[in-house]
Amino acid sequence: MLSPLGETLRRHDPDRFLTVLFAPEARRETLVTLYAFNHELARAREVASQSLLALMRLQWWREVVEGEAKGHEVATPLLAMLADGRLDAGDLLALIEAREAEVDGDFPTLEAWCDWLLAGAGGLAVAAGRALGVTDDGVLRGLRLRGAAYGVAGLLRARLVLGRQGRAPWPTDHLAALDMTAEAAAADPTDARLRDLFAHLAEEGRGFLAEARVLPAPPRAAIAAALPAVLARRDLRHMPSVDPRPRGLGDRLAVTFAGLMGRV
């Protein structure tokens, strides 16, 4: 039976919810809590009308991770898992820092953009791996790369939604080369000038996956942390559509097969 937090995760982050099902039963709730925490960090940027308000919400979560008890459906189990070592405070603080950089929204170069994804979506995959017992640096690096690839795919899939929110989290030097500002890119994510940029960013995501493949594979017990890469690989095979379809049976079967086989 799912916990209430698990039901919430299924509604708000169905991709990662599916991957949780392939974690050892004793550690599933830890992943559910970690991913629910990540969703709360994402909401801080999405629901706040001003950057200052988003930063205030992120500061609230920083205080939770640093040990301040607050009544909240995610904060309460999160604190318990930090206290008993199931989750690592350093990993969670790094995720908050990545979200703070997202609020700032300035990625001056492609390298800075990639570093942000490696810290954010990649850092979440590392935190999941550690929660599942991974300690090998090579395996953790592979998880970081796979998580970053999933982050690339997610941004490209969501670019219309991001535009409606007034956001264009793309490398500003590449936008400038197109004679575009971030504001213009947010106003019209379908502008033909952006097509080559998005294709290039998708190639960066595929590069993350290629680099991960030469690193040690995660053990079967930690395969759940790597499974978002299955979806990233499918999404990035071709540049994600401007209006992507909801996840279908093929996506779910691909994740299920990889989870049952224990390899990505």
Region annotations inferred by a language model:
Residues G85-L87, R220:
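Structured, non-catalytic alpha/beta "coupling" segments that mediate domain-domain communication
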Residues A127-A131:
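Alpha-helical transmembrane segments of multipass membrane proteins
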Residues E100-A112:
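Acidic/His metal-coordination segments adjacent to aromatic residues that form catalytic metal sites
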Residues M1-A80, L92-R99, L117-V126, D136-L156, ...:
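Catalytic cores of Mg2+-dependent Asp-rich isoprenoid enzymes
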